[in-house]
């Protein structure tokens, strides 16, 4: 396993730990999710380039599309919660109230 793969795996793990530990604010959760998606994108792109898989070359672009959709939905939810409640705490996201 090369050093770049280890760094990307470590970035993914740190983002996952950040998502699990700092769940009080919604903005920090969204940033951790974006870090996870970015590290997955880099790992997937490097794997496809190193193995010369031409059939799977669209997978990183599809992952970027899903990451953009996740970011747009997360930011719209953040704006809705912060304008409604005045803060971005995750405790405000009760499914019975939405």
Swiss-Prot record:
Q: Which GO terms describe its biological process?
A: ATP synthesis coupled electron transport
GO MF annotation, one: NADH dehydrogenase (ubiquinone) activity
User: What does the record give as the reaction this protein catalyses?
Assistant: a ubiquinone + NADH + 5 H(+)(in) = a ubiquinol + NAD(+) + 4 H(+)(out)
Q: Which residues cross the membrane?
A: 1-21, 29-49, 61-81
Membrane-topology descriptor:
Multi-pass membrane protein
Q: Where is it localised? A: Mitochondrion inner membrane
**Where on the tree of life does the source sit, at the highest rank?**
Eukaryota
InterPro entries, per the entry? NADH_UbQ_OxRdtase_chain4L/K, NUOK/Mnh_C1-like
Chief place of localization = mitochondrion
- Supply the EC number(s): 7.1.1.2
Q: What are the record's GO terms for cellular component?
A: mitochondrial inner membrane; respiratory chain complex I
| Known function | Core subunit of the mitochondrial membrane respiratory chain NADH dehydrogenase (Complex I) which catalyzes electron transfer from NADH through the respiratory chain, using ubiquinone as an electron acceptor. Part of the enzyme membrane arm which is embedded in the lipid bilayer and involved in proton translocation.
Subunit (UniProt) = Core subunit of respiratory chain NADH dehydrogenase (Complex I) which is composed of 45 different subunits.
Name of this chain's protein = NADH-ubiquinone oxidoreductase chain 4L
- What is the species listed in this Swiss-Prot or TrEMBL entry? Stenoderma rufum (Red fruit bat)
